[in-house]
Amino acid sequence: YGRWDARSTTIELPIDGERAVSNVLCIRANHDCSHLAVRIETGRTHQIRRHLAMARHPVIGDMQYGPKIVEDERLRALTYPLLHAVELEMEHPTNGSLLRVFAPVPQDFHKWLTALKLQPAR
């Protein structure tokens, strides 16, 4: 929610007493909301959702960390956080090698970006 004013920033705030770092890049913003890319350096539970809420820009549709009352009528239809992991990197559990998983952005996510006027410029 809201306009993310910085082009990029780092949020370094502890979560449950543990170090947590999120690097935020603003892809596109308007008066009401922003399309962000977030790369986390640490992997705390709900880290992106919690860090953005702490920065007073909760993920749209996040009923746990976001506002309890949604004023924008369009957004009331969302029943899930508008959040998608395009790429995940982790250590393979058995052999320790780097494992990278990619997932394309779902069509409904693109529809929301269009509805909110947040599609990246081509």
Region locations from a protein language model:
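RNA pseudouridine synthases
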Residues: Y1-R122
